[in-house]
A protein has these predicted regions:
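A mobile, often basic/glycine-rich helix-loop segment
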Residues: 103-108
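Short alpha-helix plus adjacent loop in nuclease-associated cores
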Residues: 114-131
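Acidic, Mg2+-coordinating catalytic module of metal-dependent nucleases/exonucleases
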Residues: 83-102, 131-179
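Functionally engaged cysteine thiol sites
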Residues: 19, 116, 135
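Conserved non-catalytic scaffold segment of RNase H-like nuclease domains
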Residues: 1-100, 111, 138-147
Length: 179
């Protein structure tokens, strides 16, 4: 199964305040394609909280010359929709941000199948003391830089590619553009 890992880092607590996106396509454990973009947040959400900055290390200055999400969306969308399924660790968080940013920019409708790798890990490893991405990566012997969008996306896809994904764990994300 071809999986596409997706991860966002955010500038603040507002839904849609994406400041970094990582996307990695993995098939049979091999990375086929990977991309990361620093994103200048939408003008209505254009501020960086200390809390978020301390988590991912991205500063407002890092984003000053970065494109807005609408400029990179086509590339991200192509990768997402080329995969059989998108793997997202704690999918509700990232999908809430994706839905809001698509709406803010009035971007065209999109849909894709996805699996929440957090739920998948809870299913396969109920005894684990934590199901966070870094703990699961340790369990699989993977090293990565946590809270780096590209590293998180790639690690998520690699973990999901090594696990059986029950049919009922696959969900559908649908964003319908408002007319």
């Amino acid at each position: 199964m071809k999986l596409c890992g997706l991860d966002f880092e955010t500038a603040n607590s507002c839904n849609g305040s994406i400041c970094s996106v990582g996307v990695a396509v993995v098939e049979n454990g091999e990375v086929l394609e990977r991309k990361e973009y620093l994103i200048k947040p939408h003008k209505s959400l254009d501020w960086m909280s200390k809390f978020c900055r301390d988590i991912h290390g991205i500063t407002y200055e890092d984003l000053r010359e970065s494109p807005e999400f609408s400029k990179v969306w086509q590339s991200v969308k192509t990768m997402l929709t080329s995969a059989d399924c998108v793997a997202i660790h704690n999918a509700p968080f990232d999908l809430r941000h994706l839905h809001n940013i698509l709406s803010l920019y009035h971007l065209p409708s999109v849909s894709f199948d996805y699996v929440c790798s957090l739920q998948l890990c809870r299913h396969h490893f109920p005894e684990a003391h934590s199901h966070s991405l870094n703990c699961m990566a340790d369990m699989f012997g993977m090293t990565f830089q946590h809270h780096d969008a590209l590293e998180d996306a790639e690690t998520c896809a690699k973990i999901a590619s090594q696990l059986e994904i029950p049919e009922n764990f696959i969900c559908r994300f649908e964003y319908l553009q408002n007319a």
